[in-house]
Amino acid sequence: RKYCVAPLKQYTDMHDRFLLRLISKKVFLYTEMIATGSLIYGKCFDQLEFNKEEHPVGIQLGGSNVSDLVECSKKCEQFGYDEINLNVGCPSDRVQKGKFGACLMLEPNLVSECLSNMQNSVSIPVSIKCRLGIDDNEDYEFLYNFVSIVKQSGIKVFIIHARNGILKGLSPVSYTH
């Protein structure tokens, strides 16, 4: 796999992915991030839908509770996704309050444990999306240490959002309607 279309909340829905699939048969598509709590409590089933023409398509999960991630991984596999991606890149305040997204880059051992358990619970691939760094932790050593610990989980695919995640203050990119 060479090309992936990054998920973006409120943009990469099934209609967007279908259009992207018409443009390219080679790109790997992802859902927008779905929090484990939303999936467990049934608040997001409209976001889970996809058209069979979208394959290959992965689902992106947000969470940090190992048992919740395992439960959601099993549901996602049953739903027919080709891959599960753990979001360790979203810097939003709301996501941070839920203890997932980019703030998890400060907890590589927890991320590794989550990914290892997710991977052991399903037969489809599990991957990770992370940032180059977060806040002042944006040097090569920070990313190298993070990847070195997380790769012990056995995952094979790291998707790097090639920007630093800003946890304190505004993110440097803003999308307006």
Could you tell me what each predicted segment is?
Residues 1-6:
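N-terminal amphipathic alpha-helix/helix-capping segment at the start of soluble metabolic enzymes
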Residues 8-82:
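Glycine-rich, positively charged N-terminal anion/phosphate-binding segment
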Residues 8-10, 34-36, 62-64, 89-91, ...:
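Active-site beta-loop-alpha junctions enriched in small/polar residues
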Residues 31, 83-91, 153-162:
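Non-cysteine beta-strand/loop elements that form the S-adenosyl-L-methionine
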Residues 56-57, 122-131:
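Short beta-strand/loop segments at the ligand-binding rim of alpha/beta enzyme cores
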Residues 61-118, 135-139:
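Active-site beta->alpha loop and helix N-cap motifs at the rims of alpha/beta catalytic domains
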Residues 131-145:
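Active-site glycine- and acidic-residue-rich loops that bind
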Residues 176-177:
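Conserved small/polar residues in nucleotide/adenosyl-binding loops
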